[in-house]
């Protein structure tokens, strides 16, 4: 039987490190001032996971979606925070001229 460790809190993780990193969750309680809108594909995907309220893989991505490999697959019970920055992410432009999100702010229940 596999034991389950539970962690609660408001967290923000670098998406490209979240999948492989075993480091403790980085606590973050403030929003970044300079932010870009989250691409619609990511925003709707997060809302869909939040509605399901359980651990889910990201099944709505296409192979050529540059963000696919950066989405943490172990985030459970995602709840997008009702804050000014809840629909935004800090980001930078990658080689494909897409906005690559660096951080999301969310509440999670990790099991």
From Swiss-Prot:
<protein>
    <recommendedName>
        <fullName>Putative uncharacterized protein YDR094W</fullName>
    </recommendedName>
</protein>
């Amino acid at each position: 039987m596999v034991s389950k460790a539970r962690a609660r809190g408001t967290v923000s993780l670098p998406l490209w490190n979240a999948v492989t990193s075993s480091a403790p969750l980085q606590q973050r309680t403030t929003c970044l001032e300079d932010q870009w809108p989250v691409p619609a594909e990511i925003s709707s995907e997060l809302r869909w996971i939040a509605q399901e309220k359980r651990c889910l893989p990201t099944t709505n991505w296409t192979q050529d979606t540059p963000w696919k490999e950066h989405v943490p697959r172990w985030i459970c019970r995602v709840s997008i925070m009702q804050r000014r920055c809840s629909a935004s992410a800090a980001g930078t432009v990658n080689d494909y001229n897409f906005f690559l999100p660096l951080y999301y702010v969310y509440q999670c229940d990790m099991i």
